[in-house]
Amino acid sequence: MGIKGLNKLLMEHCPAALRSSEIKNFGGRKVAIDASMSLYQFVIAVRQADGQQLTNENGETTSHLMGMFYRTLRMVDNGIKPVYVFDGKPPVLKSGELAKRKERREEALKKIEELKQQVEDGEEGEETKEAQEDVTRFEKRTVRVTPEQNDEAKKLLTLMGIPIVEAPCEAEAQCAKLAEAGKVYAAASEDMDTLCFGSPVLLRHLTFSEAKKMPISEINFAKILEGLEMTHAQFIDLCILLGCDYADTIRGVGPQTALKLMKEHGSLEKIVEHIEKNPSGKLKVPENWPYQEVRALLQAPDVLDSSSCDIKWNNPDVEGLVDFLVRDKGFSEDRVRAGAARLMKQVKVKPQARLDGFFKVMPKEGGEKRKADDKKTKGKKPATKKAKK
């Protein structure tokens, strides 16, 4: 879910930190991708014309594999070197959010049964059609990625020669730390809390389908801190105040109020102190609000040491891909072999240095110094050499 209202707040207060881009602009870049988030997207979005998930002749869901195979090929075709990072065990602090998601899923399942009955009882017409569309919409709310689908995705990526990392906890935190350590250029996730973990660059919409025509959003963390005039620690406090997956926020505090409070007080401790000194005010701090525990988790997440992550891109196992995708999962052999050929082609291509690696922006001080030197010499006659006798 990420941080409530953060993207809109950044667009308003530090627009220089965000820019829209095309996938081709990241050629030559290594990117750590939140695999768990991507799989969830694929299971929801990769569907048949009637809205049902893709399945093989045995009735096994293949939406996750179809999405993973073709979206990864698209990135590789554009010169991107992806690293997929998978979730480990969720942190204890996230249990409340997971319970809420389970409750919403159960409510959606009940609604689906009601709507299906409505479709069965109704006559052909606009109302029945709308009810069927509602069934599809609510079914998407019940989607979850199973452990088996996770394992199949890992197997597919390994056969494709794409490196994977299994995080001990949150995938987006591991992605952020790989980027922070310089192992990759950016972290790619839809979760804005990736920024809290310190990723220098966050890419959103990277794994969306080309048909959506959704530009990739590139978010620069240093420019966020500069635009908001905050430290990393203060930014984390702001995000906790906005609301995240690990704790509820203070009721009545929206994005603008959260920013105002942080500007005025500078930390959550001082904000809590301010609110508690004004018991007659509108704002009330939740009982046993675990903001300090959440802050500690965001500042020091449970991740693998980046130096221990062995990230290597290998040749695809063509026959292994055919066995798995064609014989086991019912994919088209021609398409799978064509995809493997695309992977092999990119493995053989020698990486080209990016132009932005050749040029360095000169600091303003240099320009100022030159101007000052020009003023000193202005009006002076050039020195002349004496003629040799």
From Swiss-Prot:
The UniProt entry, under Pfam families, shows: XPG_I, XPG_N
Cofactor: how and how many bound:
Binds 2 magnesium ions per subunit. They probably participate in the reaction catalyzed by the enzyme. May bind an additional third magnesium ion after substrate binding.
Using the UniProt annotation, give all residue ranges assigned to the region (Disordered): 360-389
Modified how: Phosphorylated. Phosphorylation upon DNA damage induces relocalization to the nuclear plasma.
Could you say which EC number(s) this protein's record lists?
A: 3.1.-.-
The entry's cellular-component GO terms read: cytoplasm; cytosol; mitochondrion; nucleolus; nucleoplasm; nucleus
Basic and acidic residues composition-biased segments: 362-376
CDD domains the UniProt entry points to: H3TH_FEN1-Euk (cd09907), PIN_FEN1 (cd09867)
Residues that, per the record, bind Mg(2+) 1: D34, D87, E170, E172
Question: From the UniProt record, which GO molecular function terms apply?
Answer: 5'-3' exonuclease activity; 5'-flap endonuclease activity; DNA binding; magnesium ion binding
- The answer to whether keyword Metal-binding applies is yes
The ranges of region (N-domain) come to 1-105
Q: Gene3D superfamilies from the entry? A: 5' to 3' exonuclease, C-terminal subdomain, 5'-nuclease
Name the SUPFAM superfamilies for this protein.
Answer: 5' to 3' exonuclease, C-terminal subdomain, PIN domain-like
PANTHER family with a match to the protein in the record = FLAP ENDONUCLEASE 1, FLAP ENDONUCLEASE FAMILY MEMBER
Q: Which family does it belong to?
A: Belongs to the XPG/RAD2 endonuclease family. FEN1 subfamily.
Q: How does it assemble?
A: Interacts with PCNA. Three molecules of FEN1 bind to one PCNA trimer with each molecule binding to one PCNA monomer. PCNA stimulates the nuclease activity without altering cleavage specificity.
Protein name, per record = Flap endonuclease 1
Tell me what organism the protein belongs to. Answer: Yarrowia lipolytica (strain CLIB 122 / E 150) (Yeast)
